[in-house]
Amino acid sequence: MRRSTGGRDSEEVRLESYNAAKHAGAVREAILRALVAGVSGRDQRRLYPESPMTSKSSVSRLWVKEGAKKIGEFRGREISGEFFFGLMLDGIWLSEDLTAVVAIGMTSDGRKIVLDFQVGSSENRDVCDDLLDRLVRRGFKPVARLFSVLDGSDTLKGSVLAHYPDAVTQRCLIHKEKKIRGCLSKRHYGELFDYFKRLRNAQGAETGREIYKELREFLASKNLKALASLEEAGEDIIALHLIDAPATLNVSLLSTNFIENSFRNVRAKMGRVKRWRSETDQAERWLAYGLLEAERGFRRMKGWKDIPKLVKKLKKPDEPAQRKAA
């Protein structure tokens, strides 16, 4: 509003109520960020001793309200206009009876977008199906055959193929190497590492199959349990090689590494939670906030300029270009 200065001139005056509201909004945001960063209520009261919003009950109410907004923001984002070629799925363990499956979409221009998550008692088929059903309803549609990177769960693979029957499913090499290593004597770790290093650097179907065959023979001579672990995955560990995709994309697409990095950031923010209440939206609030924060730090995929070559490999021989990025 404007206030007369006694003459012809007047000056702009900020209402005290406006300043108070603006200050309150800043304090709310600061409290929210401090909460998810692990700052205790006591320390927050030291930062804002005059604010009534730093009482334990006020902080709790604020988190319930603002956290619910984050869930809405997370699941309300428009994704139908994006040009997705891939989907990465992995589970994050919260407690003995609470797990979340997280989906990250990969676009034709190399961006990574946290799409959604589903919380359940375990990484079971219903949880995975609910997640993918919601993505379909929201408009998730790959530009060609879907390329999916999975942590190794048969449940995840089954759900992906139920929704996208012609999807290419790549098994995470890091997870599989770790499981095979657990079956071997330590003296064989070095050789195992070398085989997987060769896979991570390999280009094309012929080289991929050759290394897979050598790895299989190596494990057959060392430990039958390790061999069984490899055969459980089968050629899913060389799915990217089998479609002759550019090796420049190996770092990004042969493991669930960048989703695991997201989980580390989320766990860091959720570390102060001592008890998860499955009867509330507590887990959803923390996941929505943590994943959105993690997404802020995402960079383009390594080798992203070669993604169009991959998409071309993913198209069926008789399939015309369905959607073209501008």
Regions found by a protein language model. Give the residues of each.
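Conserved beta-strand -> loop -> alpha-helix junction used to position metal-binding or nucleic-acid-contacting
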Residues: 117-119, 145-155, 159-196
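Acidic/histidine-rich catalytic cores and adjacent linkers
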Residues: 201-326
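N-terminal alpha-helical segment
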Residues: 27-28, 192, 208-211
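RNase H-like nuclease fold core
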Residues: 1-21, 26, 30, 50-149, ...
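Transmembrane alpha-helical segments of multi-pass membrane transport proteins and ion-pumping complexes
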Residues: 38-42
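Short alpha-helical patches at protein termini and domain edges
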Residues: 46, 59-61, 154-156, 170, ...
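Short alpha-helical segment immediately N-terminal to, or the first helix within
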Residues: 33-37
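DNA-recognition alpha helix
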Residues: 43-51
